Amino acid sequence: MNSAAQKTSQPVAPYMALGLSTIACGIADRKHIQHNLETVEDVIHAAVSMTNINMPVKVIALAEGALTGFTDEIFDLPHKLAADELFIDVPGEETEFLGRLAKMYNTYIIVQCKARWPEIMDDRFFNTLFIIDPDGQVVHKAAKNHLWCREHSCTPHDIYDRWVEHFGSGIDAF
């Protein structure tokens, strides 16, 4: 066995993965997301400080809606209004905030929120999962394909031609 194969065949050192469910306040304006970010920050600090005692925390997953909540669904807001006034861009200010936490704790942070994808359509938002690496960078982003009936998010299938033009039609595009 060569040294590269030996290195990859070694067991992964034990680590902790945390799933955090925070209280998320509904947002009436994009600036209100900051309150939810501060709550997430406090909970991450507390959870990591308690958990890091036994093993390093390498993955933190936030509950769906932790940043943006579900205001658009609760109040049945028009899609364009919600996209223009409420939801984030990935990457953007909010991912930079979370990126600082990922760097601080040398961990991955997994987030789900409503986000615009201006590279696809600037007046639409998607129920988006993204992953921030320990260097604080967004390394993965995906749009939810199957929505709950009350969800107003756009899906790749709603704008199929534009999506395929940008990402292709392979299974990895969806």
Residue ranges and their predicted role:
Residues 90-119:
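A short, hydrophobic beta-strand-centered structural micro-motif
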Residues 116-174:
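Active-site catalytic loop in hydrolytic enzyme cores
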